[in-house]
UniProtKB/Swiss-Prot annotation:
Its EC number is 7.-.-.-. GO terms for cellular component: ATP-binding cassette (ABC) transporter complex. It is an enzyme of class 7 (translocase). Keywords: ATP-binding, Cell membrane, Membrane, Nucleotide-binding, Translocase, Transport. ATP binds at G44, H45, N46, G47, S48, G49, K50, S51. It is a peripheral membrane protein. ATP-binding (A) component of a common energy-coupling factor (ECF) ABC-transporter complex. Unlike classic ABC transporters this ECF transporter provides the energy necessary to transport a number of different substrates. Its main location: membrane. The lineage of its organism: Bacteria, Bacillati, Bacillota, Clostridia, Eubacteriales. This is Energy-coupling factor transporter ATP-binding protein EcfA1. PANTHER family: ENERGY-COUPLING FACTOR TRANSPORTER ATP-BINDING PROTEIN ECFA1, HEAVY METAL TRANSPORTER.
Length: 281
């Protein structure tokens, strides 16, 4: 269906408050493209429109104006809804809200069962998906006994079992501790690299965003920045003016530069910082 997995054209979305009879503009004429196989992060603080944008990517919300295309399918066409949701799976913030069965493998099988997949193929899909997220040995466990990071990996396995082309993750690490966050990020990157599945990650964690192929920054319902992580985070002043932070090492480089140290602000990780400091005379 072409090289774009997701494409929005002049997208507008308004939340209507029926009690107060007023509208809130959540997305204001946003156009964006996400390539097949890309790992894109959408960054923004609360109320920026990033989660609303995510919900348009698997037709949980439909545009008030403009268009959203998923793998070439217009989400406004009611006949496309189920196919859109099959091609673009979604993982949410709270893992407990996404798990529906009392045994891990039954939970992962839930999606393909509802698609009417043959039982033998369901078995293969469940095993393959659990292996892909490193949770195969937990297949007979009860999901409620797992850690937050493990639960999110089960949620990702459940989406993988439906054989999507794209996974949209709406702040999947927001409720996790640092080790759980690392587990989930490792899984997301492996799914993207090994299987070529397009990943759209909504986050407010800068260290997660730094690992993406490309970043889109949203503010007040508009797309305000777009580029590779190095390009985005080197604009420290602009990022801070939007109310966001930059990765800690980038912040350190920025502060050193302000003090007259000859160092680039295009530093994203500790190894790069060590190399840059070692080269100073």
């Amino acid at each position: 269906m072409g090289e774009n997995m997701i494409k929005s054209e002049d997208l507008v979305f308004k939340y209507v408050n029926s009690e107060e009879q007023n509208e809130k503009l959540a997305i204001n004429h946003v156009s964006m493209e996400v390539k097949n196989g890309e790992f894109l992060v959408i960054l923004g603080h609360n109320g920026s429109g990033k989660s609303t944008m995510a919900k348009h990517m698997n037709a949980l919300l439909l545009p008030s104006g403009g268009k959203m295309y998923v793998d070439g399918l217009d989400t406004s066409d009611i006949e496309n809804i189920w196919e859109v949701r099959r091609r673009a799976g979604m993982v949410f913030q709270n893992p407990d809200n996404q798990l529906v069965a009392t045994i891990v493998e039954e939970d992962v099988a839930f999606g393909p069962e509802n698609l009417g997949v043959d039982p033998k193929e369901i078995r293969e899909r469940v095993d393959d998906s659990l292996k892909a997220v490193g949770m195969y040995e937990y297949r007979k466990h009860a999901p409620h006994l797992l850690s937050g990071g493990q639960k999110q990996r089960i949620a990702i396995a459940g989406i993988l079992a439906m054989r999507p082309k794209c996974i949209v993750l709406d702040e999947p690490t927001a409720m996790l501790d640092p080790s759980g966050r690392n587990e989930v990020m490792k899984t997301i990157k492996e799914v993207n690299k090994k299987f070529g599945i397009t990943i759209i990650l909504i986050t407010h964690y800068m260290d997660e965003a730094a690992q993406a192929d490309r970043i889109i920054v949203m503010d007040k319902g508009e797309k305000v920045m777009e580029g590779v992580p190095r390009e985005i985070f080197s604009q420290v002043k602009k990022i801070k003016s939007i109310g966001l932070d930059v990765p800690q090492v980038t912040e350190l480089a920025y502060e050193l530069q302000k003090e007259g140290v000859d160092i680039s602000t295009e530093i994203l990780n500790i190894d790069e910082m060590v190399n840059a400091l070692c080269q100073l005379k």
